[in-house]
Amino acid sequence: MADLQAEKKLVLNYFSEIDSCDIESLTEVISKYASEDFSMKCTHPFNELGSADIVANNLWRPIKDSFSPIQRRLDIFYAGINSLDKNKGKWISSMGHFMGVFNKPFVGLKPNNKSILLRFAEFYKVENNKITEGAIFLDVMNLMQQLGLSIIPQSSGLVCVTPGPMNHKGLKFNTSNQNESQKTLDLIHRMRDRLVKGSKMQSYKEELELDWHNDMIWWGPGGIGASYTIDGYQKGHTKPFQDGLEFVRFNGHILSSAEDDLGGWFGWPNLIMKPKGEYLGLTNASDIESEMRVVDLYRRQGDKLAENWIFIDHLHFLKKLGVDLLERAKFLNQ
């Protein structure tokens, strides 16, 4: 695994300038750090964006304009070589919250003029000292829950502000032990293969116990919430997930990397699923297939996994099933 300190510094400087610049300077800042063919994959309703100007005006302008002043609160930051790209791609992965005062409408959501925490996961590929592509997952459904919108049914897990790693060592600003990084990557790949290839997205306790500590914590996305212990995870997530959805196929990931005890991936989409019943209290059984864009970040403790942070682009997934939560929110505003 390569030394990626220069790539870390580049992305940290990018974060600093994006967060501190005025809105009219966004395109200039992005152009300074990004390649000419820079593009981003974003959760709905932003979706796929190309060019510095489009990313500036379609993504960062509404974020900075709606939640002002914005503060980036990082809980996870690490670098790794993409194991899915012939071990060539250099990627920076991060997670945390954007804090701000919600004082202007955001994706049609009515502001409450109070402080909010917008949960995010962000990924950037760096080549030749330029950011060439990126992805950002915003947990808009969690924001809806913070706002108390009635369109979101009660979650099966704990709804809370998602913390970072329990050991408070989520920010890998310095170099890490390459052997520990490889251990993490091997473990999450073993767990992935057991779940996807062996069990077809079915989670059995005896298999979970092979890869997870019993007191694991599953920090789920908006609409689901967090679960504690293997038993709690099965009750709060896997049973409702398996009861409500039918697995169609696994599409793979775009990125899979690790550094020290942290690792993870994202896909676009990772999974194709269709509802076989009620999922999140919002779907009915149908033959319509829909795409799940998912982020999974993990913390390894010893030879098993201890924590998992998840983002699911539920707005995109549900819209393809005829459930448009942003339109429902606009109706509430009226």
Where on the chain are the PLM-derived regions?
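C-terminal and inter-domain tail/linker signature
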Residues: M1-Q334
